[in-house]
Amino acid sequence: MFSLASQAQKITISGKAVDNETKEPLPFATIGIKGKSIGTITNLQGEFDFHIPPEFQNDLFTINMLGYQTYEAPVWTLLGTLSLVIEVKKSTLVLDEVLISDSLNGGEILQIAISRIEQNYPMQPYLMDGFYRDIKKVGGTYVSLLEAAVKIYDEDYQEPRNKFKLRERVGLLEVRRSIGYESKFTSYFDQDNLLEDLLLHNSIRYRHFPAEEIFFTSLKREKDSYFNGHEIFVVTLKQTYFLKIFVEKGTYAIIHTEYESNQEEDLTKKRGLESKFAMLKRVIDFKLFEGKYYLNYINVDSKVNWYDLKTKKLKFETELNQSLLINEVFPNSADRIAATEKMRNYGLQYQDLPYNKEFWDNYNVIKESPLDRKIIEDLEKRGALEKQFKEN
């Protein structure tokens, strides 16, 4: 069984990352310890709580974000600082425009990157510690929250034969959920395992790129960017959907992707209503550790419109926000997730465990923001969340 002993005796760095010129917050910046696989990310307001073992207090604390210089400071210099605000500088590297000597176009860059996936991503078994969250919203009101601490085991990044069958094996450490998971509105959401669906959104792991030549010829190369001391190719596609891919120069590793589609698509009919897919937004980010790129975080937002079957009028909207943050990576792992510990393929709300407050108090989650406080306000109409976690 998985040990939770490592959750005890941790030290915490809390703060906010901002642009050093504009003072604007830096959302989804990667927080970490140099040379270690432990990490978290900032929220929409650039805020973070980072729980780390005390033996890391003499190591270097780091913040990385696309287009910015890497921020580094000894951990011990940040401990105990009230209202810690860290100003991160934009990259001062002079980046050439698209017309540069290497002459590669967007399609060629991505084709090389895809061909090098097995060089740049793990090809030996590995384990990841992760934090999963899904939030459901109906007609503008948040109705449910589920969070889980998970272990994820995978063999490698070899291209799967079936790109729609989960290759990773997931073990649940802790699960907590709000009362809203028993709401009548939950039937308007997919009742399957939503974490399994989220992992299948990893376009690099599951090679979701079209094979047709027209896809590659439609890609446009944008101005280069900068990340963690390296120049980055930026490739985009703007057609019926938007796609943006960041590829590290030299290794051709895909380090970050953004995808958005707003095309309406018929889905299903239920209780005198018909549903149409309205929006999908996906962000995938990778982090380098010991020469290989591992999943850092994945966010997926989706929206479905529900119409009256007879009048065709919009009745309400359902929205689902899913996030998976990887807290720590264990390369070349000899550990496995036993069949008895494996997550089942039905909804996580039916696999919840007794609430463990001490565990969650010391676990790296995505820090709540003002937006999250609106979520909490909606959910607590049925009682304090802490009480809901205990009773569900």
Question: What are these language model-derived features?
Answer:
Residues 29-33, 46, 61, 100:
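Hydrophobic beta-strand segments
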Residues 37-47:
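Short, acidic Ser/Thr/Gly-rich low-complexity loop/linker segments typical of extracellular
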Residues 206-259:
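Extended beta-strand-rich segments in extracellular/periplasmic secretory proteins, especially
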Residues 9-26:
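Structural motif
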Residues 85-218, 225-230, 276-392:
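Surface-exposed, low-complexity/disordered segments
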Residues 48-50, 82-84:
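Short strand-edge motifs at loop-to-beta-strand transitions and within beta-strands
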